[in-house]
Structure formats: C-alpha cells, structure tokens
A protein has these predicted regions:
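N-terminal loops that bind phosphate or other acidic moieties
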Residues: 2-363
C-alpha cells in the first residue's frame, strides 16, 4: 500500500521535458489484434475494445493481458478562483468529499469496490490543515491562489505537484498495479480546466466552459468572463503549456499531469476520467512527447470542452452517458467494461471449438 512517507524526485521544467519514454510494444499490439481475430466472433466484433485492449497489452508488454490489480488515484485540491463566485459550492465541500473518499463512501469508492479497484485519495492541495485518516498527504499548499488576481501556482509548486503524481504511479507499479484510473475532487476545477483548455487549444472560452456542478445562467456568464479576463491578463494564447498550467491550472490538474507522465515512464495504462483528466493528459502530452500513447479514454462527459479535447488527444471514449460526477467514476466504470472484454479475449473460444469456419480479413 502507499504510505505517506513517499520521497519524490523533483525536476526542473527542462529536465521534465527531457525524460525518456520507451514506447509501447508495437509488435505486441499487432499480436493481440491477431489473437482477437482467432476468437469465434465477427472480425472486429468487439469494436473499440479490441484496439483498446491491444493498446493496454502493448503498454504492459504482454499478450496475456492481466489488469486484475487496479487503482484509481484521486487528486484533491482547492482552487483560489472560487473567490470569484464561479461555483455554487464553497471550498469546505472539497474537504467533505475527500473525507468521504478516504472512507470509500463516495461515489467512486462504491464503484471501485464493485470494480475490484484500490482507491488512492490524495490531499495535494486541500485548503485545510486537518489530518484525515485514509487520505494520502502530498499537500503542496493549502489551495491555489486566485488566478483572477495572480498566477495560481509558482513554478516550484507546479513541479512539486507533477512530481507527486509521477511518484505515486511509481509506488503503484512497485505494488503490482497493472492499470490506473484518474480521478479528482476540487471545487472550482471545471473553471481551471476550462481555462486551460481554452488556452491550450487557443479557442473561444465560451465553447469550452460549462456549468460544472450546476451553476445558473448568470454564474456561467461570470465564469466565462473570469476565464476570458485571465487569458487576456496573462496573454495565455501565446504562452507554453507549463506556463498555462502554472497560471490558471490547479494542484489537482498538475498532480494528474504527473500521473499521466508516470504511466508513460513506468508503463502502466492510464484510464482517463472526464474533462479535468483530459485537460491533464493533453498538458502532459505537450510537456513530454509520447505520453498520450499510454492513455485509455473512458467516457464523454457533459462539459463542452470534451469534444475538442478528444480530438486533440485523438481518442474516442466508449461510454456516452452524459456523466458529470467526476471523482474518477467514469474511468472506474471503464475498468468493468475492460474486464468483460478481456474475459472474451482470454477465454479464447475459437472457431474450431464451435465447428465454424474462421472469418477471413479482406480489408
């Protein structure tokens, strides 16, 4: 299990960008796709799950794909921009939900138990000094600064959060974990993720900004104005990814950037949750080439940025249920679907087993 005394390696931005990633095994990917063709079913009959499981096997370097040991890492942090009235909830909700996560009583905790996954809730920046049993302590600071007034984080704080995410994945790998899901909790993080999406994609703020946990029309207008003002204030359309993350991102997002990078470094597939995880993955991939080869999409969330982020990440989520819960719930739901798909793959009922001629691939 992960303990609170993890010691992280700290990187400079330049060192971070120079980390070496060994790509997934392309031959293994082809082998697994060929194995799927031997299963008694129409060619490509399992749809996206055939290439997604092949991708997982290529990351793990094993055609006998084993994802029995799973974990969901939930980065919990507060965001100073909440002071601008962009959420109907206060920062006290972040701590309350994090406590529920620590007891495995939150939505993702219930779902993880069903999926057979460990839960790793992380205090990477909750605005409280309360010690919570079951909450991994990796606090960088007590919430970010209000980016409407000043940059959310310093360079050192951003790097510390990224480093924490990488190191947690390292420990998961050492503990035998075979696949990881991303999750988060932080009031105001649909604002930080929308700001990052708009800046990284260089698109209109309104096209990527949604209602989050359910703000009204005036709240949405205020949220858009706050983000627009920040992009103009810091000239973010002309800044690089790290500066965007540091300026309008959150500690939860920076931690998940580290999780995505850690998945690539330690060859553990990373199943993304919704918009906040997608923003984190896009930032990670832009900071370090090759990271996105290790990510697996799960669901199309309700936030409007999702479609553009999926396009930028070249991913196609398989779950379309208008989810907007966060915490990693969609990613954990994907665990169950992957297990079912792999039961077909590993069961290997062949055409000979059912006395049927094998399909031939013509295209």
């Amino acid at each position: 299990m992960i303990e609170n005394n993890i010691i992280s390696d700290h990187f400079t931005v330049e060192e971070l960008k120079k980390l070496k990633i060994t790509p997934p095994d392309a031959k293994m990917y082809k082998k697994i796709r060929s194995n799927w063709d031997l299963v008694a079913k129409p060619l490509d009959g399992m749809g996206d799950f055939e290439f997604l499981t092949a991708k997982i096997g290529a990351v793990l370097g094993d055609e006998n794909i084993d994802i029995s040991k799973k974990a969901v890492i939930m980065m919990c942090a507060d965001n100073g921009v909440v002071a601008e009235g962009i959420s109907q909830s206060g920062q006290d909700v972040t701590l309350a939900v994090a406590k529920s996560m620590a007891r495995k009583a939150s939505s993702v905790g219930r779902m993880a138990m069903t999926a057979g996954a460990d839960t790793i809730p992380v205090d990477i920046g909750i605005n409280s000094d309360e010690s919570v049993k079951g909450l991994l302590q990796r606090k960088v600071r007590m919430g970010t600064r209000n980016f409407a007034k000043e940059p959310a984080m310093t360079k050192a704080e951003t790097l510390e959060a990224i480093s924490a995410g990488i190191d947690i994945v390292r420990v998961c790998k050492a503990d035998g974990c075979r696949i990881i899901a991303t999750g988060e909790m932080g009031i105001g993080n649909t604002t930080t993720s929308a700001a990052m999406a708009a800046a990284m994609l260089r698109c209109d703020v309104a096209t990527v900004t949604g209602r989050g946990a359910g703000i009204n029309d005036s709240g949405l207008e205020r949220k858009i104005r706050v983000i627009e003002s920040a992009i103009e204030k810091y000239d973010l359309y002309n800044k690089d990814t790290f500066e965007i993350l540091m300026t309008v991102g959150g500690l939860d997002i920076a931690g998940l950037v580290g999780v995505c990078i850690g998945g690539a470094l330690y060859h553990i597939p990373v199943v993304l949750d919704g918009v906040i995880s997608m923003v984190s993955a896009l930032a990670a991939g832009r900071l370090l080439s090759g990271v996105t080869d290790f990510i697996i999409p799960s669901h199309e969330g309700r936030e409007p940025a999702v479609a553009l982020l999926c396009e930028a990440l070249s991913v196609r989520p398989v779950i379309r249920a208008s989810l907007a819960l966060g915490e990693g719930t969609g990613a954990v739901m994907m665990f169950a679907l992957l297990d079912m798909a792999l039961s077909v793959y590993k069961g290997r009922t062949t055409f000979d087993d059912i006395s049927v001629s094998q399909y031939e691939r013509y295209v």
